[in-house]
């Protein structure tokens, strides 16, 4: 009898202190069950490319065999259904280079601890008199999660094994609850945290080249949109800007609605006010009337990315404005930064190499 009470106590204790984890587990399993039930499954029990949203299949196809099983579907739901947190752990499904470290700082703005991941090349510990370039990487998706695209550090590490490429410090950023925006509505200020807190923190703590010539900015999807906005808002902070997979259709919609983001792909029908003129189209146009330095820009996209046509339209828009930039396209790649890095990460890394300063 006493044993039963002990078991009951353990059960109550577990539910009380781990109810969020339990609900998350139940939600994921329900998502897998009903998701697989709703979608067409072939006779072998797999999802195929034509059964999923165009331009995004590789996000589910973790092993690259052009089929998605329940385990892969479960991992996808788990990754993109996490509650927002200012500190996140790496996905234990993957192996990361030992040069990738977890960092954190106390945010005055948010009155909390904010995490980041930082890749520190071996040369940093070997060349103690040298200062190093930095590249800030802004993740895709919402809400913010500094661990989401930290797997890219594997590709970066392999590329830096080439002694002809000057290594850099890469910082993987948490963009806040409304990724990379300031939001009074959500009490989340990802933009201000990056610009006013994280960058100064990194420059104080590490031997960085503390000027725009030695500081790069890169992002994908939501992060790709953000880095394009930031290059025009803070041109004196960054020397190079690499924008991948961004939805410039949504940026255009924000422009046309005078600051409201109403993403038609959002099933929750959330509408956020992000600021009139706070979009990649308006900011680029305003920049042409200024005398400000223009960072070196590269737009990049997979040809099969669902955002490709919008990126191409933005590319032509920049050409009309006279804003010089590169447009790097890869065939057989969809909306997946890992796949892009796997195929041609070297081009992305080399883009940020130090060059003599020049601008419009």
Report each predicted region and the residues it spans:
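Primarily EF-hand calcium-binding motifs
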Residues: 30-42, 53-64
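Membrane-interface motif at the C-terminal end of an N-terminal transmembrane signal
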Residues: 14-30
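Amphipathic regulatory helices of Ca2+-sensor modules
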Residues: 48-58, 70-81
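Hydrophobic membrane-insertion alpha-helices, especially the h-region
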Residues: 4-18
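Glycine-aliphatic tripeptides that mark coil-to-beta-strand junctions in extracellular
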Residues: 45-49, 66-70, 132
């Amino acid at each position: 009898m006493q044993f039963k009470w002990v078991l009951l106590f353990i059960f109550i204790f577990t539910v009380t202190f781990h109810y969020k984890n339990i609900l998350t587990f139940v939600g994921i399993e329900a998502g897998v069950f009903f998701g697989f039930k709703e979608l067409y499954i072939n006779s072998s029990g797999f999802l195929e490319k034509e059964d999923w949203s165009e331009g995004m299949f590789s996000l589910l196809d973790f092993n690259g065999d052009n089929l998605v099983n329940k385990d892969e579907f479960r991992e996808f739901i788990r990754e993109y259904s996490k509650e927002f947190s200012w500190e996140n752990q790496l996905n234990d499904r993957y192996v990361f280079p030992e040069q990738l470290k977890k960092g954190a700082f106390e945010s005055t703005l948010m009155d909390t601890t904010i995490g980041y991941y930082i890749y520190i090349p071996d040369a940093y510990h070997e060349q103690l008199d040298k200062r190093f370039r930095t590249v800030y990487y802004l993740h895709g998706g919402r809400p913010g999660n500094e661990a989401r695209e930290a797997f890219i550090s594997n590709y970066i590490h392999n590329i830096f094994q080439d002694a002809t490429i000057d290594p850099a410090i890469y910082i993987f950023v948490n963009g806040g609850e409304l990724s990379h925006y300031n939001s009074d509505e959500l009490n989340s200020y990802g933009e201000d945290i990056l610009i006013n807190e994280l960058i100064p923190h990194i420059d104080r703590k590490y031997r960085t080249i503390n000027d725009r010539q030695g500081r790069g900015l890169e992002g994908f999807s939501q992060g790709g949109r953000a880095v394009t906005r930031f290059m025009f808002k803070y041109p004196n902070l960054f020397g190079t800007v690499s924008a991948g997979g961004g939805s410039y259709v949504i940026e255009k919609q924000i422009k046309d609605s005078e600051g409201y983001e109403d993403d038609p792909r959002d099933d929750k029908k959330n509408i956020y006010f992000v600021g009139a003129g706070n979009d990649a189209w308006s900011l680029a146009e305003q920049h042409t009337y200024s005398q400000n330095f223009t960072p070196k820009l590269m737009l990049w996209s997979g040809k099969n990315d669902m955002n490709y046509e919008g990126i191409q339209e933005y590319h032509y828009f920049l050409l009309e404005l006279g804003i010089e930039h590169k447009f790097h396209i890869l065939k057989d790649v969809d909306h997946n930064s890992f796949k892009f890095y796997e195929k041609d990460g070297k081009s992305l890394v080399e883009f940020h190499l130090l060059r003599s300063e020049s601008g419009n």
